[in-house]
Amino acid sequence: MENIRYLYHSLLVEGSARALHWNFAASRDRKAKLRRPEFAALAHHVASEDVRLKAEADAAPSDDARLAAAVAWVFRAQQATPDAGVSLGYFPLDVEGGWHPSYPETTGYLITTLLDYAAQYQRADMRNAALAMADWEAEVQMPSGAVQGGAVAPPDKQTPAAFNTGMVLDGWCSAYEASREQRFLDAGIAAARFLVTDMDEAGYFRTNGAFVSQRETKTYNCLCGWAMLRMARLAGDQRLERAAVEAVEAALKRQRKSGWFANNCLGMSSIPLTHTIGYTLQGVFEVGVLAERPDFIAAAEHGLTSVLRKQRRDGSLAGRFDKRWNAAANFACLTGSCQLAVVAYRFVELFGNRDLLILADRVMSFVKRTQRLAGDDPNMVGAIAGSYPILGGYMTGGYPNWATKYFIDALAAPTLPVNLARGAPRCTLRLSVCSPLFNLSES
């Protein structure tokens, strides 16, 4: 049924028969490559995924071991490039050597992840690596203040992208907070000004960049609002703060009664990825917290609860959902699963929501079991794949760095059961429009 929904939306709703053909052709070519001896390690990985999933459940390595392996992989992904950026990811079937060039967008928000990790675990090497990333981002920033879409490219090949700019702005905010170096504040202010000028009268960002569909404004761009609001507070810029709130108000105009958001995918908005659903929910929630907007937080809770309730018995989530929250893909988008868990853990941290804690833990239990802590190819060890199975429909056949980034964020979340046991949640903001979550005993 999930595959039937995917085909229906691909052919009849999105009208993308050509894209569907090329996706199948690319999948066929990747499977053919797996027969070649140089890809033996990945072929073994593909053949043994289900067996290993059960073995990981039986072994149950500690979260500390998983977290350390994931952080080590990000460090390896940075070292795999000739600059201080982080490789887009490891895709042995797609490029010689497996490693793609540095990717400005996700290097940007990895800065925040690594600085948080460095502070929590007293890792000066990770702090230095993160600040080097922030310096590199400033070096490749476009004259307009924007950040380029796609992997790093020479100036004459760069095209600006609002979303990518927002994610690097997030990194510059964190780098400035950690170092108080003026160059990070200057780069961030330039990026924030680009984002403000890129917004239309309705509050939507206009510049998608060259690597996503151009026919619509993207709801998930509202995540830029969080970084904009952070910079507004650092720079004392009220205009920027108003723009951040307007970006989320615009996104909420596209939320349906079910909690689902329209125009919310890289390329197939009738069945968005959990990846872009996660981006939107994080943006709505975090701006709601900083701006003290209970309506934003309630909207995020509604969407988050609706999608997390759709998890399968093993904790996995379908990679795509239609407007009625019907599963529309049979693969799991592991990135999106981690992102949704991150937002859920933030809800629990601030508001003490036990039901969301249970749901997020189930999702992360599945994702953890897909992580390899040993193997013949060290470039796979510690990373999280784009999809489960790895030849599924998101970032097929490889390990995008942002999947591991959100895995780290989820595992490094506060020790939530301890916080809950101590009593009152941290945040005193009252959710006047939130309805109670469902009773898990009924699911």
Q: Model-found features: residue ranges?
A:
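Glycan-recognition and catalytic cores of secretory/periplasmic carbohydrate-active enzymes
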Residues: 1-443
